[in-house]
Every structure is written in structure tokens, then in C-alpha cells.
Amino acid sequence: MMLEHELVLSAYLFSIGIYGLITSRNMVRALMCLELILNAVNMNLVTFSDLFDSRQLKGDIFSIFVIAIAAAEAAIGPAIVSSIYRNRRSTRINQSNLLNK
């Protein structure tokens, strides 16, 4: 894949993720949009790592760390959302002000 195509795809994924985070009212949808953003960042890391110096794997290794953080977020995020749902009976972001109670 050419560099421009990879960067356009990454920018497209990032834009969809940002739009979803801004407009989402559901916590699960917001977590999914956050995953899209992290995947777009990983694509940029790997693309620019290959472009600037293909012999060193700094971008690839950093991308693996970001994937590990995303996996932890994917494991902990739904547990937090289900706990909030059990207590509040809603997963809407605007209805779950946790500082009031």
C-alpha cells in the first residue's frame, strides 16, 4: 500500500473516531470510537516508522505498547460500563454524572 493511501485511511479512521466521541451519548459507542482512534494512531506509527527508517522498529514496538493499552481498555471499559448500568440503569453519558451521588 502506498504511503498516501495509508495516511488517508488513518485520517479517515481518526476522523470517524473523533466524530463518534463528540456526538455519542452511549458509553459503549464512545469506547468503540476510542478504539478506532487508537487503531488510527497505530497505523500512523507503523507507517512513519517504515517510511523514515525501516531497519529500526521503534514505531512498531511503540505500536505494540499502544495495542496492549487498548486491550486493557477493552477489558476494563465494559466492566465499568456494566457496573454503571447496574447502579444507574442507563449507559447514557449525559445521565451518568458520578459526582452527584
Swiss-Prot record:
<dbReference type="GO" id="GO:0009535">
    <property type="term" value="C:chloroplast thylakoid membrane"/>
</dbReference>
<comment type="function">
    <text>NDH shuttles electrons from NAD(P)H:plastoquinone, via FMN and iron-sulfur (Fe-S) centers, to quinones in the photosynthetic chain and possibly in a chloroplast respiratory chain. The immediate electron acceptor for the enzyme in this species is believed to be plastoquinone. Couples the redox reaction to proton translocation, and thus conserves the redox energy in a proton gradient.</text>
</comment>
<keyword id="KW-0150">Chloroplast</keyword>
<keyword id="KW-0521">NADP</keyword>
<protein>
    <recommendedName>
        <fullName>NAD(P)H-quinone oxidoreductase subunit 4L, chloroplastic</fullName>
        <ecNumber>7.1.1.-</ecNumber>
    </recommendedName>
</protein>
<keyword id="KW-0812">Transmembrane</keyword>
<keyword id="KW-1133">Transmembrane helix</keyword>
<keyword id="KW-0618">Plastoquinone</keyword>
<dbReference type="GO" id="GO:0019684">
    <property type="term" value="P:photosynthesis, light reaction"/>
</dbReference>
<comment type="subunit">
    <text>NDH is composed of at least 16 different subunits, 5 of which are encoded in the nucleus.</text>
</comment>
<keyword id="KW-0520">NAD</keyword>
<dbReference type="GO" id="GO:0016655">
    <property type="term" value="F:oxidoreductase activity, acting on NAD(P)H, quinone or similar compound as acceptor"/>
</dbReference>
<feature type="transmembrane region" description="Helical">
    <location>
        <begin position="2"/>
        <end position="22"/>
    </location>
</feature>
<keyword id="KW-0472">Membrane</keyword>
<feature type="transmembrane region" description="Helical">
    <location>
        <begin position="32"/>
        <end position="52"/>
    </location>
</feature>
<dbReference type="GO" id="GO:0042773">
    <property type="term" value="P:ATP synthesis coupled electron transport"/>
</dbReference>
<keyword id="KW-1278">Translocase</keyword>
<keyword id="KW-0813">Transport</keyword>
<dbReference type="GO" id="GO:0030964">
    <property type="term" value="C:NADH dehydrogenase complex"/>
</dbReference>
<feature type="transmembrane region" description="Helical">
    <location>
        <begin position="61"/>
        <end position="81"/>
    </location>
</feature>
<dbReference type="GO" id="GO:0048038">
    <property type="term" value="F:quinone binding"/>
</dbReference>
<comment type="similarity">
    <text>Belongs to the complex I subunit 4L family.</text>
</comment>
<dbReference type="InterPro" id="IPR039428">
    <property type="entry name" value="NUOK/Mnh_C1-like"/>
</dbReference>
<dbReference type="InterPro" id="IPR001133">
    <property type="entry name" value="NADH_UbQ_OxRdtase_chain4L/K"/>
</dbReference>
<keyword id="KW-0934">Plastid</keyword>
<keyword id="KW-0874">Quinone</keyword>
<keyword id="KW-0793">Thylakoid</keyword>
<dbReference type="Pfam" id="PF00420">
    <property type="entry name" value="Oxidored_q2"/>
</dbReference>
